[in-house]
Regions:
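Short hydrophobic/aromatic patch on the recognition helix
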Residues: 34-44
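Short secondary-structure transition hinges
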Residues: 93-127, 134, 168, 172
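An amphipathic alpha-helix signature
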Residues: 81, 85, 122, 126-130, ...
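Hydrophobic/aromatic-rich alpha-helical bundle segments in the mid-to-C-terminal region
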Residues: 103, 111, 133-181
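A short, glycine- and basic residue-enriched loop/turn
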Residues: 5, 21-23, 38, 47-48, ...
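Hydrophobic alpha-helical connector segments
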Residues: 53, 57, 67-96, 146-150
């Protein structure tokens, strides 16, 4: 990737961080970088193309963050707990980016790189779950099913927090405890 393209992505990332996804426009990006609008379009076909590149980068960041969080953890259940806490924290710290990654459907044909990056992250989680199953630490269900269950749980937990439905009266105010409890439900 060339410098200008990466700088365009960095400016876009800052715009999302400061003003949300709706604050991003090709014209505004060009202005911030002192480029003509046509110069921006030489690197990205449109705003959607640029956002797709950001999403791929976000998945790479999440994957890296997960990798760093599990270094040195040998216990499969503790490893899964670390992954889920990492997902949760990533979502909260990067709300708009998380919504861009998980809150919209990306066309597989038009943006295969987004699909590949998302699937790589899913497959990484599935591999850890499969390993935990091999070691007889979690329930014996098809790996795809158990991974889908884990994904549904953690994404639901993040979305409940985003919506402000993490009230103590519902028992939703302690995500780490909920993650631990969820894992105890799938342990053998």
């Amino acid at each position: 990737m060339n410098d200008t393209k990466q700088k365009l992505m960095n400016v876009t990332r800052q715009m999302i961080d400061n003003g949300g996804i709706d604050s991003v426009s090709m014209r505004e990006i060009g202005k911030k970088m002192q480029l003509s609008r046509s110069a921006v379009y030489r690197h990205f076909k449109n705003k959607e193309d640029l956002l797709a590149a950001i999403v791929v980068e976000n998945f790479e960041m999440l994957e890296s963050s997960i990798g760093n969080s599990i270094k040195g953890i040998n216990n499969p259940v503790k490893l899964l707990e670390s992954i889920l806490i990492n997902y949760y924290d990533f979502g909260l710290k990067n709300r708009d980016h998380y919504r861009l990654m998980f809150g919209r459907e990306w066309d597989k044909e038009q943006y295969p790189e987004v699909y590949a990056a998302a699937f790589k992250t899913f497959d990484t989680s599935a591999a850890f779950l499969a390993k935990a199953q091999e070691q007889k630490c979690i329930i014996n269900k098809p790996t795809k099913v158990i991974t889908a269950m884990v994904y549904a749980f953690i994404h639901g937990l993040v979305e409940l927090r985003f919506a402000g439905h993490d009230e103590p009266e519902k028992g939703l105010n302690d995500p780490h405890s909920l993650i631990s409890s969820f894992l105890s439900m799938i342990r053998v």
